[in-house]
Amino acid sequence: MSVGILGTKLGMTQIFDEAGVAIPVTVVQVGPCVVTQVKSKQTDGYAAIQVGYGEVKPKALNRPLLGHLAKSSAPALRHLKEYHTDGSSDYALGQEIKADIFSVGELVDVIGTSIGRGFAGNQKRNNFGRGPMSHGSKNHRAPGSIGAGTTPGRVYPGKRMAGRLGGTRVTIRKLTVIRVDAERNLLLIKGAVPGKPGALLSIVPAKKVGK
C-alpha cells in the first residue's frame, strides 16, 4: 500500500475544463501531515509509517500521546493514522507530507465516515417500495411481512429492517484528482466523498485501477 494523507472536507463546487464542461469537485484541505513513527520489518514485523494531522492545544491530549509525539518533535496532533509501505525507510521522523504527493489525473480512494441520519425507516434506509396510498389501505410506509409462518417461526438474521442509517466507514474508489494546489495544500477531487464539511478523510492512491 502506498502512503496516503489525512485531510478535511471543505465542501463541493464546480470548475470548468477547456471545453467549458462543468466538473463537480470536492475541495479537500490535506495535510500537512507529520511523520510521527516509522516502522520496519526488522523491529515491528511490517513496514509502515504513522502520520499525524490536526494540530490542537496540548491540554486536549493525554500525556502518553504527548510523549509519543515528542519523539518526532511533532506538535500536539489529534489524528494519527498508519499507512503500510515497503519504502518506510525513505521517511524520517518529523518529515512533512503535503498535497504534492498526488498529481493531476491520479486515481485515489477516499475513506471517511458517512453522514449519520439517525433512526430511519425501510424506505429511506433500504430503498423499499411503499404500500398503496388509497382505497382503504392502512399500510403506507410499514415494512409488511418480515418472515414466514410456523416454519421457521422466526425472523432470519440479516433481514433488512428499519434502524440506524449512516455514520459508518465508507470508501469511495477511483476518484480522479482534478487539481492540486500545493501552496494551500488543497486537492480538488472529482465527484462526492463521504461525510459533511469538516469531516476527516483519508486519501490514498487507488488500489484497483482496472475497469
UniProtKB/Swiss-Prot annotation:
UniProt KW RNA-binding keyword: yes
InterPro entries to which the protein is assigned, alphabetical: Ribosomal_uL3, Ribosomal_uL3_bac/org-type, Ribosomal_uL3_CS, Transl_B-barrel_sf
Gene coding for it: rplC
MF terms in GO: rRNA binding; structural constituent of ribosome
Record's GO cellular component terms: cytosolic large ribosomal subunit
Family: Belongs to the universal ribosomal protein uL3 family.
Region: Disordered, residue numbers: 122-156
Stretches that traverse the bilayer: none
GO biological process: translation
Keyword ATP-binding: no
Lineage, broadest ranks: Bacteria, Bacillati, Cyanobacteriota, Cyanophyceae, Nostocales
Record function comment: One of the primary rRNA binding proteins, it binds directly near the 3'-end of the 23S rRNA, where it nucleates assembly of the 50S subunit.
Taxonomic source organism: Nostoc sp. (strain PCC 7120 / SAG 25.82 / UTEX 2576)
Subunit structure: Part of the 50S ribosomal subunit. Forms a cluster with proteins L14 and L19.
Pfam families: Ribosomal_L3
HAMAP family in UniProt: Ribosomal_uL3_B
Keywords from the named record: Ribonucleoprotein, Ribosomal protein, RNA-binding, rRNA-binding
This protein's name: Large ribosomal subunit protein uL3
